[in-house]
């Protein structure tokens, strides 16, 4: 292997692309060789990402598969849903490792793309080959993976909250509700009526409450763990913070367990997981996205309302890090045989 892996970031002008660059520019084993943007081709990267001044001297270029294959060993696709699938097959044929941050290869059942994304998937064979890039659940499969499907942020928060619950049979319930509060950066760099600052500030606004498409990912992964059909309703809420996502996942206890037993089961499930922190019994008793901002950590906690046997598990992440770019690099590291935390030894910001 070369001293450093040459990486390309396709779609490098958005928030997720910029976050990938922020991580990769200090990664000890990568060299950023190509950064593409159709809109800003020819312009300096630091013009669009001023936080990278003095760190990246490259200009954005137009995306060309043939040219990029000569300059890169691995490629991160930070593109809209339905776009990456047009490029991934040829990139794989050219021998590149592909990390796709869209939803195009996350779901194993091609029929689900008709339901949730309104298109028929043209490469169902690649869905079988793609590895869902949640390292806490797929670490071994990610080793030497060539096509990584990086999870969605709301799906990540929900799955991390519920995985230990279904895996360790803390409850026999098969239906869960995940209430996710998420910051405005989830909406991307291009403002819309819903993400425009005057409209978003001071808002707590539910959206896609009748069925959020990240539920398909959550059900797929949780059903696999539980070896049973799990149903998840994800109800996201847009809040006025810029970064961060908090999933509060609700269910009912069907088994008589003391809280210490629940804590032990969750802690054991996540034992040795580099970026999982279990939050319990301090002056900040529940996970809060404020304390993971800028990092790849996921803080996990829970609460039991004994009166009605309600169990709520919490998962706090930075939606641009563990919910997007950070997790993508974490999965990439594993696929390359690097240290899992290369480029990701980032301390959360405080205050944030």
Curated annotation (Swiss-Prot):
One of its GO terms (cellular component) is cytoplasm. It catalyses: [amino-group carrier protein]-C-terminal-N-(1-carboxy-5-oxopentan-1-yl)-L-glutamine + phosphate + NADP(+) = [amino-group carrier protein]-C-terminal-N-(1-carboxy-5-phosphooxy-5-oxopentan-1-yl)-L-glutamine + NADPH + H(+); [amino-group carrier protein]-C-terminal-gamma-(L-glutamyl-5-semialdehyde)-L-glutamate + phosphate + NADP(+) = [amino-group carrier protein]-C-terminal-gamma-(5-phospho-L-glutamyl)-L-glutamate + NADPH + H(+). Keywords: Amino-acid biosynthesis, Arginine biosynthesis, Cytoplasm, Lysine biosynthesis, NADP, Oxidoreductase. GO terms for molecular function: N-acetyl-gamma-aminoadipyl-phosphate reductase activity; N-acetyl-gamma-glutamyl-phosphate reductase activity; NAD binding; NADP+ binding. InterPro entries: AGPR_AS, AGPR_type-1, LysY, NAD(P)-bd_dom_sf, NAGSA_dehydrogenase, Semialdehyde_DH_NAD-bd. Pathway: Amino-acid biosynthesis; L-lysine biosynthesis via AAA pathway; L-lysine from L-alpha-aminoadipate (Thermus route): step 3/5; Amino-acid biosynthesis; L-arginine biosynthesis. The active site is at 153. Its EC number is 1.2.1.103, 1.2.1.106. NADP(+) binds at residues 13-16, 319. It is found in: Cytoplasm. It is an enzyme of class 1 (oxidoreductase). It holds the Pfam family Semialdhyde_dhC_1. One of its GO terms (biological process) is lysine biosynthetic process via aminoadipic acid. Gene3D superfamilies: Dihydrodipicolinate Reductase, domain 2, NAD(P)-binding Rossmann-like Domain. CDD domains: AGPR_1_C_LysY, AGPR_1_N. PANTHER family: [LYSW]-L-2-AMINOADIPATE_[LYSW]-L-GLUTAMATE PHOSPHATE REDUCTASE-RELATED, N-ACETYL-GAMMA-GLUTAMYL-PHOSPHATE REDUCTASE, CHLOROPLASTIC-RELATED-RELATED. Belongs to the NAGSA dehydrogenase family. Type 1 subfamily. LysY sub-subfamily. Involved in both the arginine and lysine biosynthetic pathways. This is [LysW]-L-2-aminoadipate/[LysW]-L-glutamate phosphate reductase. It comes from Saccharolobus solfataricus (strain ATCC 35092 / DSM 1617 / JCM 11322 / P2) (Sulfolobus solfataricus). The gene is lysY.
